[in-house]
Amino acid sequence: MRPAGRSANQVRPVTLTRNYTKHAEGSVLVEFGDTKVLCTASIEEGVPRFLKGQGQGWITAEYGMLPRATHTRNAREAAKGKQGGRTMEIQRLIARALRAAVDLKTLGEFTITLDCDVIQADGGTRTASITGACVALADALNKLVANGKLKTNPMKGMVAAVSVGIVNGEAICDLEYVEDSAAETDMNVVMTEDGRIIEVQGTAEGEPFSHEELLTLLALARGGIESIVATQKAALEN
């Protein structure tokens, strides 16, 4: 029995609250159960130096956790003077995932920065960040079109992510913290809305997993992501 009584393939309740802050071109509070992340999308004219003159845009991301997002307080990374390896890995993942959602040539020479700040962590903060940031990105791109700065919306489709894993020998979808900390296998999967894979991060924490178990986990992830994408689209229609 899972902690919340969920079935193996069931994601936690997902809520996407748009326009959560007033200054950013796109802002979303995303909630996966008790995991809560504030995602904002900020537009700047111009691109990084390595892209200048190429007629395409860029999407980048930053990720962080509030000190008391977790069970015990973690000092701000700014106070330590440097970002941790986990933070850098996650923000690169978010940026890669969201670049797959956009035609960068159609975006033109704009840079969109996605800031994902974890308010409360209960497992799956990176997958929640990708899911919420995609909706914030969609709102920001819609504003570029509405303001006449772009003729065509460069959004190719939604992107979402979910964690899957093996806990006590059972493959399950969307792990909360107590499950994640006990997982024999832990995996994060990012997909497009039509089920194509953008990224898979999978690790055997204990017993190695088989090829068949990998396919089972990917199928679980696809089902979970289909449900999450439906929630994303419903949020954008409201």
Swiss-Prot record:
A biological process term (GO) from this entry: rRNA catabolic process
Encoding gene (name): rph
EC number: 2.7.7.56
Matches recorded under Pfam families: RNase_PH, RNase_PH_C
Function: Phosphorolytic exoribonuclease that removes nucleotide residues following the -CCA terminus of tRNA and adds nucleotides to the ends of RNA molecules by using nucleoside diphosphates as substrates.
Disulphide connectivity of cysteines: none
Organism: Salmonella typhimurium (strain LT2 / SGSC1412 / ATCC 700720)
SUPFAM superfamilies listed in its UniProt record: Ribonuclease PH domain 2-like (SSF55666), Ribosomal protein S5 domain 2-like (SSF54211)
Record NCBIfam families: RNasePH (TIGR01966)
The protein's enzyme class: transferase
CDD domains in alphabetical order: RNase_PH_bact
Quaternary organization: Homohexameric ring arranged as a trimer of dimers.
Catalytic activity: tRNA(n+1) + phosphate = tRNA(n) + a ribonucleoside 5'-diphosphate
Similarity field: Belongs to the RNase PH family.
Keyword Nucleotidyltransferase among UniProt keywords: yes
UniProt KW keywords: Nucleotidyltransferase, RNA-binding, rRNA processing, Transferase, tRNA processing, tRNA-binding
Protein's recorded name: Ribonuclease PH
Source domain of life: Bacteria
InterPro entries reported for this sequence: ExoRNase_PH_dom1 (IPR001247), ExoRNase_PH_dom2 (IPR015847), ExoRNase_PH_dom2_sf (IPR036345), PNPase/RNase_PH_dom_sf (IPR027408), Ribosomal_Su5_D2-typ_SF (IPR020568), RNase_PH (IPR050080), RNase_PH_bac-type (IPR002381), RNase_PH_CS (IPR018336)
GO molecular function: 3'-5'-RNA exonuclease activity; RNA binding; tRNA binding; tRNA nucleotidyltransferase activity
Binding site for phosphate: R86, G124, T125, R126
PROSITE patterns for this protein: RIBONUCLEASE_PH
Lineage: Bacteria, Pseudomonadati, Pseudomonadota, Gammaproteobacteria, Enterobacterales
